[in-house]
Each structure stands twice: as structure tokens, then as C-alpha cells.
Amino acid sequence: MIGRIAGILLEKNPPHLLVDCNGVGYEIDVPMSTFYNLPQTGERVVLLTQQIVREDAHLLYGFLTPQERTTFRELLKITGIGARMALAVLSGMSVQELAQAVTMQDAARLTRLPGIGKKTAERLLLELKGKLGADLGALAGAASQSDHAADILNALVALGYSEKEGLAAIKNVPAGTGVSEGIKLALKALSKV
């Protein structure tokens, strides 16, 4: 599986990207939330990816944050939700908005997304209940302690730690700590476990 790609962004054509990785160009589909936060073409980009292997294709989906990728994976577990629809959900609302809709059981909010009818919205609410809120709450708590929580978490995940381990370690990082110092403190906390 390809879990992360770092390289030069060659093309941007929503929702498709072409990223050059040491001479190999990877086509990656991304949600619009990721697309709008990408660097300019010709610049370096790092994406967390989800690879899907089908009979007729190997597909890559990219995300800037671990939360987006985790949510994408949770959406794929739901019957009737494929990669395209999961991408549409993440393009139509942020992970935080989706978690809020799930917490409030707001089916009407989900039906505003393209391709999501009432039954699909209700299935999403049922299947995602309790799966998004805890992680987002943990990240929000960590973010209040460190201004660079997302960057530190991305670095820890890139080093092979799970998101859960990373979130627990970030709780030991004081507010106002820089990214590099925050990573050191988080790694120190992880080494004690």
C-alpha cells in the first residue's frame, strides 16, 4: 500500500493531481478541502494517501491531514459508499462539520451534498456515530495545548506512529511550542510508553 507521497506538484485539475516522485508521476484524486490548500504547481507537496485496488485500476486518494484520511476510510466502510461518494462528502463539508452533523444526527445537512439522499444520509449518521467525534475532540484538545498540533501529528504519523498514539503524545506539548520542539517533546513522551 502507498500511504504517503512526497514530491513536486506538476498538475492541478480539480479533483485530480499529478505529483512527480523521483521521476514517477502519480495521479491522485483529492477532496476539495485538500485541493484548496495545496501549494502552487512546481512546489513540493506531501500527501497522506489511500490506495484502492480494483480489477481494472489502482487508484490513489490524497489528503493533507490524518483526520481527512481517517474519515475517508470510515466512509468507505459504509455499505453503498464508494470512494467517489466519500470524496464528494469530504469535498462538500469539512471533517469537523461532518462530525458535528453526526453528533447532532442532522440528516438534512448531509442531504445537501451531491449524491446523498435521505436513506444514505441516515445510514451515514448511523454508521459514523461515535467514530468521528472522539478523535476530533482529542485533536481539538491537543490543538488548544499546541498551536502546531496538526503539523506535529502529521510528522508523528509519517514516522510510523498511529494517530491515537500521536494525539496522546501531543497532550504533553505546551502551548506556543514550535513544530520541531513539539515533535521532540512528543517523541520523548512516546519513548516513555
UniProtKB/Swiss-Prot annotation:
Residues 1-64 are annotated as: Domain I. It is found in: Cytoplasm. GO terms for biological process: DNA recombination; DNA repair. Belongs to the RuvA family. Has three domains with a flexible linker between the domains II and III and assumes an 'L' shape. Domain III is highly mobile and contacts RuvB. The RuvA-RuvB-RuvC complex processes Holliday junction (HJ) DNA during genetic recombination and DNA repair, while the RuvA-RuvB complex plays an important role in the rescue of blocked DNA replication forks via replication fork reversal (RFR). RuvA specifically binds to HJ cruciform DNA, conferring on it an open structure. The RuvB hexamer acts as an ATP-dependent pump, pulling dsDNA into and through the RuvAB complex. HJ branch migration allows RuvC to scan DNA until it finds its consensus sequence, where it cleaves and resolves the cruciform DNA. This is Holliday junction branch migration complex subunit RuvA. The gene is ruvA.
